[in-house]
């Protein structure tokens, strides 16, 4: 089959201490400190064969994530920008949906023809973090499109336990093609759902929510905030096209952060009280978190979703005197996240279809 494959050179930076685990597995914990000179091409790849508990999916739709871009974009020394867990070469693509075309001999929950979307975090279920209920922090984690072959391909094999049926989404949109496209947005939406409602504990209806960034994660956060009853949703995004999308999915106010002082804007909108819930989805916390800090309501929350391997200036006294909290979030697995997002989309309470703005073939 054909797949969109990224390869890169293992060339750790002089100040990066490669662990024995990294040497043994070929996986880099901090990708932007190890992988250099990335090369991206469509090429032949072996057809996947299902294991006993696996299904083979014919990929129907796969979204382009900011992470995919950061695998190919580089710094001045030609190191990839993505700072997380990676192993190359591999097929990219992890926001996807597909139709079951083959099942392993022990598969019990799926059959040929089923429509599904899939978790990207391949957790083991045996390690201490998994057994304690933290699958997103699995000690043996693999990630589709990061460390194992992804879905920018004709087919992909996955364990049935990571698949979720999307019939409700297809029924909502009235046809399979649109259902598959919208279902491919489930994974990034689950990343925002996990961060906002599992990690940070959500917010009360009527609370004011700010979102920094309007990529797929930020747009999903806006849609979820609207569905959860936010009183005001304000978004900050440098792209004019994405600002328009932010309005379409639920933002009440949108701004170019280069043209305003975000913290001052939020204080004005809230009449001096500050915003209750802040979402960092821009991957630029050194710029965004200080603005959130200026506009933290009493008992306010900041949740970090965007990936950025950098230190952030913050006055911790602000968290103390405002009884506020800062949450880090990773992944999307467990905690009813996938089924709840599918229910929201199927019920029509969350519609991110406007953010599908272009379609490309594998070639």
Annotate each language-model stretch with its function.
Residues 161, 175-260, 264:
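Mid-domain Rossmann-like dinucleotide-binding core that forms the NAD(H)/NADP(H) cofactor-binding site
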Residues 116, 208-211, 278-280:
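Conserved hydrophobic beta-strands of the Rossmann-like cofactor-binding core
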Residues 46-63, 77-128, 169-170:
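Glycine-rich beta-strand-centered segment in the early N-terminal region that forms part
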Residues 83-89, 94, 124-212:
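NAD(P)H dinucleotide-binding glycine-rich loop of Rossmann-like/cofactor-binding domains
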Residues 67-73:
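Cytochrome P450 core scaffold surrounding the K-helix E-X-X-R motif
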Residues 11-61, 87-89, 106:
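A short N-terminal beta-strand-loop micro-motif at the entrance of redox/enzyme domains
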Residues 6, 200-205, 228, 240, ...:
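Glycine-rich cofactor phosphate-binding loops and adjacent beta1-alpha1 units
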């Amino acid at each position: 089959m054909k797949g969109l494959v990224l390869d890169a050179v293992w060339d750790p930076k002089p100040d990066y201490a490669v662990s024995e685990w990294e040497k043994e597995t070929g996986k880099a914990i901090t990708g932007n400190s190890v992988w250099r000179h990335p090369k991206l091409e469509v090429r032949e790849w072996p057809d996947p064969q299902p294991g006993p508990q696996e299904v083979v999916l014919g990929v129907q739709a796969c979204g382009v994530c900011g992470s995919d871009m950061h695998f190919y974009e580089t710094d001045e020394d030609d190191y990839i920008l993505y700072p997380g867990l990676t192993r190359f070469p591999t097929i990219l693509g992890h926001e996807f949906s597909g139709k079951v075309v083959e099942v392993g001999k022990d598969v019990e929950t799926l059959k040929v023809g089923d429509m599904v979307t899939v978790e990207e975090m391949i957790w083991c279920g045996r390690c201490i973090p998994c057994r304690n209920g933290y699958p997103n922090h699995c000690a043996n984690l693999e990630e589709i499109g990061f460390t194992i072959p992804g879905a920018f391909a004709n087919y992909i094999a996955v364990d049935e336990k990571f698949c979720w049926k999307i019939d409700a989404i297809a029924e909502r949109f009235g046809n399979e093609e649109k259902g598959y496209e919208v279902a491919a947005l489930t994974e990034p939406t689950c990343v925002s759902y996990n961060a906002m409602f599992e990690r940070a504990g959500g917010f009360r209806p009527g609370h004011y929510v700010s979102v920094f960034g309007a990529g797929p994660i930020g747009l999903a956060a806006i849609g979820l905030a609207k569905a959860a009853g936010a009183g005001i949703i304000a978004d900050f995004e440098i792209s004019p096209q994405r600002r328009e999308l932010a309005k379409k999915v639920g933002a009440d106010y949108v701004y170019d952060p280069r043209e305003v002082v975000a913290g001052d804007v939020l204080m004005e909108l809230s009449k001096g009280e500050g915003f209750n819930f802040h979402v960092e989805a821009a991957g630029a916390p050194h710029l965004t978190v200080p603005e959130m800090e200026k506009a933290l309501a009493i008992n306010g929350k900041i949740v970090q979703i965007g990936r950025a391997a950098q230190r952030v200036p913050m006055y911790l006294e602000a968290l103390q005197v405002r009884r506020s909290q800062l949450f880090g979030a990773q992944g999307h697995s467990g905690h009813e996240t996938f089924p709840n997002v599918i229910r929201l989309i199927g019920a029509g309470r969350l519609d991110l279809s406007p953010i599908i703005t272009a379609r490309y073939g594998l070639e």
